[in-house]
Amino acid sequence: MEKQAETWIAPGAVVVGDVTLGCNSSIWYNAVVRGDSAPIEIGENTNIQDGCVLHVDAGFPLKIGRGVTVGHAAILHGCTVGDNTLIGMGAIVLNGAQIGKDSLVAAGALVPQGRSY
């Protein structure tokens, strides 16, 4: 794991593997960030809220841009999320999906594998 200045990881959060955390990013309580099969990059000023799961498969890295909020209990799996985007609570974004900058993924939404928005 590589951390930049002012990064915060809550007690009870788990961050393992090939994970890069940008400046002023935060990982909140009970979130799991597992870069065990491919890298995970979390941009600066991004927050991963309580209970989120961020994971990867071989060939499907996870890249989260700057200024992103990933809402409580969301699951991001091997996808790309653009800058200044909100991933709503309980949303699921699957391998190879691409969410553009300045976007909103609704709470509880499912973004299927390989889709781009």
Model-predicted regions and their roles:
Residues 5, 10-11, 16-17, 22-23, ...:
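Left-handed beta-helix
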Residues 39:
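Phosphate/pyrophosphate-binding betaalpha-module
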Residues 115-117:
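Short, charge-rich, low-complexity interaction segments located
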